[in-house]
Amino acid sequence: MKPNSFIKPLLYKKHAQPICWIDDSTLIYYFFGQFISFNIETKNESVVGNIKLSLKEKLLSFFSFTRRLFRLYVFSPIFNRQKHEIVFSFNGYFCSFNLKTKEFFREQKFGHCARRVLSICLCKDGDVYYGEYPTINDNSDVCIYKRNNDKEHVVVYRFKSGDIRHIHYICEYNNDLFCFTGDEDNETKVLRFINKNFDNEPDYLLSGSQNYRTCVGVFNNNSLFYLTDNPYFENGLYSYNLKSQLVERLFCVEGSVIYGLHSDNKLFFSTSVEYNLCKDKNNKNVRIKIDGKNGGIRSNQSILYCFDFKKSQLKVLNKIKKDIFSIKYFGIGTFMFTCNNSKKYLATFTYALNRNESLLIYDIEED
């Protein structure tokens, strides 16, 4: 990576949503129902498969305006290299596509009228875990699901109604499964299921504060590094030591963080431009102006960051302003990422920003 903070993208490709890297130079991206293989260096590309869109999905996917309104994108993709399989959420379903057999399945419809999930975790044994992200509060349990090698989906753990609102993130570390929940203080938890044993109650590592509300976390040297998703107070990059149980804020950032990518000794992430909030005297949410001083959203730009674990250094790589369209209907402004990394390149997707629906490729290879 170049020593200066801001880096200019190597290339720009409109409407191409990056999904995963097949190798360090070959990217799979999604566009209008197609998975397309694109070699960054030769510029060769070819269609490798299709999502079977319904007539309604085809019509709504045709225009960027309606794609955004109905969230017709690939969310939370995971690539299983051994099986040549991409699993992801799309339009209210847990889906899978096999690059080798070209088979596409809508395996499981999400409950609670959910359009997507925020996190899918592929474990070392091939099992997949994901948590529900309800769109509506229907007074039912919010669940963690396990999807096995036979594509069977079963509930492994239930949060009772009213306990949490969303499951933000799930990941594996040392054979344990970690679950991160939100949104309000009493709903914000970081849990550990030891050896993925769901018969016993999980360990509660952190809970009860917006400082523990996160959608992006990475384990490094027995510490959890995580970014906060906090619309009320200043956001930051934190570390939590699993042994000492000490929490330390390492850096402040300009907004809530929902998307990130762990790449070797680096963590790439982006801030989001969403509603900036405070609580009134009745503990109700009140929207406030983005002024750089109050609330959790301190900038009307989405900022692309890189954190270097070895150097304990944070760099700003790019900034793009949120577009003029409604957050409620057309989404928060942010950069999205692939599900895995290339040692040479970083692929990002601009969402609800002034340069919208754009694949941006950056050179991140060390000098």
What residues fall within each predicted segment?
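A short beta-strand motif characteristic of beta-propeller blades
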Residues: 6-11, 46-48, 59-68, 103-111, ...
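Repeated scaffold domains used in trafficking and secretory/extracellular systems
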Residues: 12-24, 57-81, 112-122, 163-169, ...
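Entry beta-strands of beta-propeller and related beta-repeat scaffolds
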Residues: 25-27, 84-87, 126-130, 176-178, ...
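Recurrent small/Gly-Pro-centered beta-turn motifs in extracellular repeat architectures
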Residues: 30-32, 88-91, 130-134, 179-183, ...
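Structural motif
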Residues: 33-37, 93-96, 137-145, 185-192, ...
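Asp-box/WD-like beta-propeller blade repeats and closely related beta-sheet repeat scaffolds
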Residues: 99-123, 131, 139, 154-159
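Loop/turn-rich, solvent-exposed surfaces of beta-rich toroidal or solenoidal domains
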Residues: 223-235, 251-325, 329-333
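Blade-level signature of beta-propeller repeat domains, shared across WD40, Kelch, NHL, RCC1
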Residues: 332-367
